[in-house]
Amino acid sequence: LSEYLKRRYNARVHRLVIDASFTCPNREKSGPCIFCDPTGSGFNALHDLSIREQVLKQREWAMKKYNATKFIAYFQSFSNTYAPVDVLRERYSEALVDDSIVQLAISTRPDCVPEEVLELLDEFKTKVDVSLELGLQTINPKTLRILRRGHGVAEFIDAVLRAKKHGLEVVAHVIVDLPWDELEDVIDTAKTLSYLGVDGVKMHSLYVVEDSPLGEMFKEGAFQPVSFEEFLERTIAFLEHLSPNIVIHRLTSDPPKTGTLFARWGLSKWQIINAVETELERRNTFQGAKFKPAGGGQLNRS
């Protein structure tokens, strides 16, 4: 991703993670998704600061450590479209401190994208690039119910199609090693994302945090994480069936440093990335190796 962003913006680009004090409709109704912790799966240590202060402090650090000169304002925690439009406009605007912010990335649920929000994001497209990150996790409806996602596949498809009509860049989040999924579910997820024409994918590995429903299930022995070998098999299959035009934003998760019951089989992020790359090379395969365009890829010869 870093090389892709460098080519796109002709500069070193760094992502600034923002906690804008939003919440989530699930938490107000039936409770959070089972994997979500009290921070809304966001780990910004600066969440007590204003949005502007979060941006400025992170930017200063990234400029010194990475020599970054351009930045993505990434609204990560909870559902970042779940508020009145006027509130959203104010908080998004606060992140655009100056011209060094080249992209606004908004992470949310597919059932929290009403038309007025898409129209608001249209407004921001005149100032910066805008990407909409939508959590799908899996194409398997039974697994979605176990995860307590509170939406189905149809809502995700609807959100993607409407966002694309507005010319928005769409990034999908998936978890490839869900214990309730099979290999076929992972492959079908890759195919669906490809046919929908999403622009990017963030692939996550399942981790278990203490203060979450999943954490309680883990301690009770209600499920077993899949093995690393199975994770690797699913990751390779997902990549093979994914359109080569889709940008891979990540290959594994970044779990919190404390309060984690299970994460990445005790491996570092780079060990997992290296293992995936090594396995791709060993099998002489690549992203899109088994991808077939919609309609079976048959040319119309009439």
What residues fall within each predicted segment?
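Core AdoMet radical
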Residues: 39-58, 66-85, 100-113, 129-155, ...
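Hydrophobic faces of well-ordered beta-strands that scaffold small-molecule active sites
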Residues: 14-18, 71-76, 104-106, 130-134, ...
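Active-site-proximal loop/turn and secondary-structure-junction residues that shape catalytic pockets
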Residues: 22, 77-81, 110-112, 136-140, ...
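Structural recognition of alpha->loop->beta junctions
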Residues: 33, 94-101, 188-202, 272-286
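Auxiliary Fe-S-binding modules of radical SAM enzymes
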Residues: 1-3, 9-13, 200, 208-302
